[in-house]
Amino acid sequence: NTNSTAPVQVRGLSDVIAIAGGWYHTIALKSDGTVWTWGNNEHGQLGDGSNTNSATPVQVSGLKNVITIAGGGYHSIAVKSDGTIWAWGKNEYGQLGDGSTTDSFIPVRATRLTSISAVAGGGYHSLALKSDGIIWAWGRNNYGQLGDGTTTNRTSQVQVIKLTKIASIAGGKTHSVAIKSDGTVWAWGYNVFGQLGNKTTTNSATPVQVKNI
């Protein structure tokens, strides 16, 4: 495995319509609804049923009709056309959302949620946006990155409080961000470096509005 300072083409992969990255792995969605992954696989984040690294794309086991994807630190997330969420990889903090803390080398369904329009991955947490504009979150919550007003880890989904009419979501390592339909930006979680954008360096377990934007 050789590093490259210039772009190299991923071999054997075509008709790709979306791409996502984890910390050391990559996820691709093809137009036929299948998902392909490559890179580090120590926690099963490639979803091929093994924990063997792969330098070429492998198909995620048993996953079809996928419409959107996201990458977390060591886990992967997908939404199927029926609006259900599926996730695989590291699950130490419940970031797969299946109610357990057991890693999974194949996709497992995240419980409770349907009608999902978008997903995002953080370092050890996950976010989902429902078609009604509400955000749900699960996984590690040591800095309040789930936005439920606590710092309690969650193995199943909790609603991000005080936020409605959301249009877009994103996850950082230990914080989360959302855009409302009115164009305002909101953030929550770790803030020691000011990443919440609210003119403080105080962590927040509930969403705060990003200032001057």
What are these regions (language model features)?
Residues 1-6, 38-56, 88-106, 136-156, ...:
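Short glycine/serine- and acidic-residue-enriched loop/turn motifs that recur at repeat junctions
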Residues 3, 15, 22-23, 53, ...:
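Beta-rich catalytic cores
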Residues 11-18, 31-34, 56-68, 81-84, ...:
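Tandem repeat domain/solenoid detector
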Residues 12-15, 22, 39, 47, ...:
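Glycine-centered flexibility motif
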Residues 24, 33, 73-74, 83, ...:
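Short coil/turn segments that connect the beta-strands within blades of beta-propeller domains
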Residues 25-28, 37, 75-78, 87, ...:
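Conserved core positions of repeat-based scaffolds
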